[in-house]
From Swiss-Prot:
This is Leucine--tRNA ligase. It is found in: Cytoplasm. The gene is leuS. HAMAP family: Leu_tRNA_synth_B. It is an enzyme of class 6 (ligase). The keyword ATP-binding applies.
Length: 878
């Protein structure tokens, strides 16, 4: 059934309520839209544009918060506007459903994590439905369901066959609370787990990795293609990839014929200033090169460093510590003997695990050398300066070489190339690119994740599970509380299998995948959600992708967004895709913040219910003054706002309007109950405006054919109405493109409603029909329920959300008269109304004949008259 004038959801003139009752109205239209399958995705017709609007799908916690609301409402407005513009729109939703929160909740509540997750999904779907989102729920996906993670496993095997998935022993970040491995990106700047907050430990385990580093150059270079992404996100990814162009330098170890320490440097021009070499404490050469008299201190230092995370070791504000190992190396540039140290700031997993120390030209090396009284040798001076080094600083910029033998007098840029080439001839240097990016560690030692489809055989090694045996499903009856390893390892009936290759006894892989594996391709599945033969069809993907508009938080700039780009490129190389990038445009919405009351002396947050005077808040415990701040909403800060409570009181349309109006989408939004009330009052005013038209027995205003208004036959008031209508159409249309200024679009709707409120009832039927039709259609993406109600109440045929987006008429914007500013000596002294098509000569005559000129010129002719047609006349007295 198609929604129409006779639809059961439509209130007739007799039974329509006389006041705005959003709850009943919204429930009625949500039910009707679901019955009509209004938002089902239709394949694009020939010549029709396909538009894919997508929000980053949520973890199903069971509770919708205001951050969710902002994300999904923003995407919904974009999807609705594009649908009205004639595009075929794909706007799906799913659930990022694996992960530690569900497993931890299951342990705490003694419930199966699958049951827990499915229950949460249903709760959140019901909450989302109340927002009136134009989502095609027939394409819904949940990453924890076997019909989805079957294809995650299949894609893993594709990557494995490409050589992009591999296993190796590695020192990894271990979360002692969640008992699992973390990728580098999941450890914060304080060395804590991104989820549990525990201090991360270092542990040596055999782990699965993906070779994302194979795509480092492509991931970096193709950032230039992403013109529709925020510059901040592109910069964050570029910095994370961290491409450095330089050289590898070999330092031969004294008295160890075969031992060579290789370092990477971008400053080969400083090579003659190297006064020591530093190894990572974990570097394999440390054990063989350490002198006997230094073994005890080296061992103690290594134990100390082992307790620190990588971020702690490299933090700029932390003193750098080290110990000498009792061995020396030879500087290949000048043959000088230099000591070998180990230090906490050098990481085994980054670069070669060794660095050269140039104290005179690196701030970190300078501080380290000063701490341990190591030599400081200057080999670069700034152009045009004397050879002088301040005691308290290093010169880190380029300059002219000195104390560098044959390279003295060369510029840094020239010397970098010359020294590298010289070393390459002699066999101790070679050009090199290095990256900060590390391969993606995907192993997790937890139950609630996608099983890795590999079987380990003593004879055959790591054997892929055959594709026809997928999915490898998660077993039931697993002890989730086991510590120190994967819970799956404890279930022998699941672990012990036959090798698919040789038939001998073998064991399943018991690690599960990082949840980002599942979210790195879900946008592809939405394009072909019911395919049982493959993860997706390339033609279906090409029809919809890249995603034209992706919406999500800035916190995913490196993790999810980088991994998704990697997946897309790897699958393209595999021949499974034809696209180069997954997301054409990206909008990173700001946080939703609520007011907090904090005791600055104790750090304690006080609930608003405990604050007796909001104007002078005091802590009820110690009576001290409280700080009043706006911070990200959270339970611990007592500043959360329940979306359900807002909808129960004001309706979803008001919640949507507030979220969109309060701040530009990329900025943080400060919650304000008064502004929510203000949006509710605005919608009530719109209700009264539409009622004022209907009260004149015009409930078929949008149903009966009406000739469009013609400019020549319009009254001045009707001309003003048309100008206001078409000004709003132009402005709102512009605001719903590019940077999406929803707040200014709603401001335009407010202006239009103010103009129409007094003038519309007296206008002709044609002007009324045009104005009301445009107003309702412009409102539809923002307040979809109320717009639908208005549309049908005035006799509109079919849903307003199927109507074409209004187009502005440039002719309607042309005014018959304009207000001309009169200036005297450059200062505004008044205005006059003149015909819009006046010549400069006529404007001058009218200005001189005006009361303004008579008053300020005192009857004297001006020395000069400056005319700016349509804007102003400036009179310069004689």
């Amino acid at each position: 059934m198609t929604a129409s004038k006779s639809s059961s959801a439509t209130a007739s003139a007799s039974d329509r309520p006389d006041r705005y009752d959003p709850i009943a109205l919204e429930q009625r239209w949500q039910s009707q839209w679901q019955q009509d399958d209004l938002y089902a995705t239709r394949s694009p017709e020939p010549g029709q544009n396909a538009f894919y609007a997508l929000s980053m799908f949520p973890y199903p916690s069971g509770s919708l918060h205001m951050g969710h609301v902002r994300n999904y409402v923003i995407t919904d407005v974009i999807a609705r506007a594009q649908r009205m513009r004639g595009d075929s729109v794909l706007h799906p939703m799913g659930w990022d459903a694996f992960g530690l929160p569900a497993e931890n909740a299951a342990i705490e509540r003694q419930v199966d994590p699958g049951v827990w997750t499915d229950r949460n999904i249903e709760q959140m779907k019901a909450q989302l439905a109340r927002l009136g989102l134009s989502i095609d729920w027939s394409r819904e996906q949940a990453t924890c369901h076997a019909d989805y993670y079957r294809w995650t496993q299949w894609l893993f095997l594709e990557l494995m066959d490409q050589g992009l998935a591999y296993q190796k022993d590695a020192t990894v970040n271990w979360d002692p609370v969640d008992q699992t491995v973390l990728a580098n990106e999941q450890v914060d700047s304080e060395g804590r787990s991104w989820r549990s907050g525990a201090l991360v430990e270092q542990k040596n385990l055999r782990q699965w990795f993906l070779r994302i580093t194979n795509y480092a150059d492509a991931l970096l270079d193709d950032l230039d293609l992403l013109k529709g992404w925020p510059e901040r996100v592109r910069t964050m990814q570029a910095n994370w990839i961290g491409r450095s162009i330089g050289a590898e330098i070999d330092f031969r170890v004294s008295d160890h014929d075969d031992a060579v320490i290789t370092v990477f440097t971008t400053r080969a021009d400083t090579l003659h200033g190297v006064s020591y070499v530093v190894l990572a404490p974990e570097h394999p050469l440390v054990a063989t090169l350490t002198a006997e008299h230094q073994r005890e201190s080296v061992a103690a230092f290594r134990d100390l460093v082992g307790e620190l995370s990588a971020d702690e070791r490299t933090a700029d504000d932390r003193p750098k510590r080290g110990v000498p190992i009792g061995a020396t190396a030879v500087n290949p540039a000048n043959g000088e003997s230099i000591p070998i140290w180990i230090a906490d700031y050098v990481l085994a997993g980054y670069g070669t695990g060794a660095v050269m120390g140039v104290p005179a030209h690196d701030e970190r090396d300078f501080l380290f050398a000063r701490t341990y009284e190591l030599p400081v040798k200057r080999v670069i001076q700034a152009a045009g300066t004397s050879d002088h080094l301040s005691d308290g600083e290093a010169w880190t910029g380029p300059g002219i070489l000195l104390n560098s033998g044959r390279f003295d007098g060369q510029s840094s840029e020239e010397a970098r190339q010359e020294i590298t080439a010289h070393g390459q001839e002699l066999g101790w240097a070679r050009p090199k690119r290095q990256y900060r990016l590390r391969d993606w560690l995907i192993s997790r030692q937890r139950y609630w994740g996608c099983p890795i489809p590999v079987i380990h055989c003593d004879h055959c090694g790591a054997v892929p599970v055959p594709a026809d045996q997928l999915p490898v499903t998660l077993p039931k009856d697993v002890d989730l509380q086991g510590k120190g390893g994967s819970p799956l390892a404890s279930l022998q009936s699941w672990v012990n299998v036959k090798c698919p290759s040789c038939g001998r006894d073998a064991r399943r892989e018991t690690d599960t995948m990082d949840t980002f594996m599942c979210s790195s391709w879900y946008f592809l599945r939405f394009a072909d959600p019911h395919n049982t033969e493959r993860a997706f069809d390339a033609d279906a993907v090409e029809r919809w992708l890249p995603v034209q508009q992706y919406v999500g938080g800035i916190e995913h700039a490196i993790l999810h967004l980088l991994y998704s780009r990697f997946f897309t490129k790897a699958l393209r190389d595999r021949g499974l895709l034809n696209i180069r990038e997954p997301f054409e445009r990206l909008l990173t919405q700001g946080m939703v913040q609520g007011v907090t009351y904090r005791n600055p002396r104790t750090g304690r947050y006080v609930a608003p219910s405990e604050v007796s005077d909001e104007n002078a808040p005091k802590d009820p415990v110690d009576g001290g003054e409280l700080e009043v701040l706006f911070e990200k909403m959270s339970k611990s800060k007592y500043n959360g706002v329940d979306p359900a409570a807002v909808i129960d009181r004001y309706g979803a349309d008001t919640a949507r309007m507030f979220i969109l109006f309060k701040a530009p989408p990329e900025k943080d939004l400060e919650w304000d109950d008064a502004d929510v009330e203000g949006q509710f009052r605005f919608l009530q005013r719109l209700w009264r405006l539409i009622e004022s038209v209907r009260s004149d027995d015009q409930d078929q205003l949008l149903g009966d054919p009406v000739d469009p208004p013609e400019g020549s036959g319009l009254s001045d008031k009707e001309g003003e109405i048309r100008r206001a209508v078409h000004t709003a159409i132009e402005a709102v249309s512009d605001d719903l493109k590019g940077d999406f200024q929803f707040n200014t679009a709603i401001s335009e709707l407010m202006k239009l409603s103010n103009t129409l409120s007094g003038a519309l009832p007296e206008a002709s039927r044609a002007v009324q029909a045009e104005a009301v039709s445009a107003l309702i259609r412009l409102l539809a993406p923002f307040a979809p329920h109320l717009a639908e109600e208005f549309w049908f109440s005035l006799g509109g045929q079919d849903s307003v959300h199927k109507q074409p987006w209004p187009l502005h008429d440039p002719a309607a914007l042309v005014r018959d008269t304009v207000d001309l500013v009169i200036q005297v000596k450059g200062k505004v002294r008044g205005t006059i109304t003149v015909p819009a098509d006046c010549s400069k000569e006529t404007l001058e005559e009218l200005a001189l004949a005006s009361d303004v000129a008579e008053r300020w010129l005192e009857g004297k002719p001006p020395r000069r008259v400056i005319v700016v047609p349509g804007k102003l006349v400036n009179l310069v007295p004689s």
